Amino acid sequence: MPSIFINIILAFATALLGTLVFRSHLMSSLLCLEGMMLSMFILSTLIILNMHFTMSFMMPILLLVFAACEAAVGLALLVMVSNTYGLDYIQNLNLLQC
């Protein structure tokens, strides 16, 4: 396995670990999710280019579309929570009381 794949998998694992460590802040969780999506995009692009899958060149672009939608929804949720409660701590929120 080339070292570029190991580096990208390590970046994904680091972002996943960051999500687990910084789960109390919504902004940190969103940044770690974006890091995971970016590493998945790069890894899928490299695999498709190395394996010459001509029929699945659209997969990384579809992944970027979903990442952009996830970022937009996450930032809208962050703005709503910070305007309502004045902070972005997830542990202090009870989302069942809408």
Swiss-Prot record:
Domain of life where this protein originates: Eukaryota
Catalytic reactions on record: a ubiquinone + NADH + 5 H(+)(in) = a ubiquinol + NAD(+) + 4 H(+)(out)
InterPro entries named in the record: NADH_UbQ_OxRdtase_chain4L/K, NUOK/Mnh_C1-like
Cysteine pairs bridged by disulfides in the record: none
Enzyme class: translocase
TM spans (from-to): 2-22, 29-49, 61-81
Cellular-component GO terms for this entry: mitochondrial inner membrane; respiratory chain complex I
Membrane topology of the entry: Multi-pass membrane protein
Signal peptide as annotated in the record: none
GO biological process: ATP synthesis coupled electron transport
Localization in the cell: Mitochondrion inner membrane
Assigned keywords, A-Z: Electron transport, Membrane, Mitochondrion, Mitochondrion inner membrane, NAD, Respiratory chain, Translocase, Transmembrane, Transmembrane helix, Transport, Ubiquinone
EC number(s) stated in the UniProt entry for this protein: 7.1.1.2
GO molecular function, one term: NADH dehydrogenase (ubiquinone) activity
Assembly: Core subunit of respiratory chain NADH dehydrogenase (Complex I) which is composed of 45 different subunits.
Role played: Core subunit of the mitochondrial membrane respiratory chain NADH dehydrogenase (Complex I) which catalyzes electron transfer from NADH through the respiratory chain, using ubiquinone as an electron acceptor. Part of the enzyme membrane arm which is embedded in the lipid bilayer and involved in proton translocation.
Sequence similarity: Belongs to the complex I subunit 4L family.
Protein name: NADH-ubiquinone oxidoreductase chain 4L
Recorded name of the encoding gene: MT-ND4L
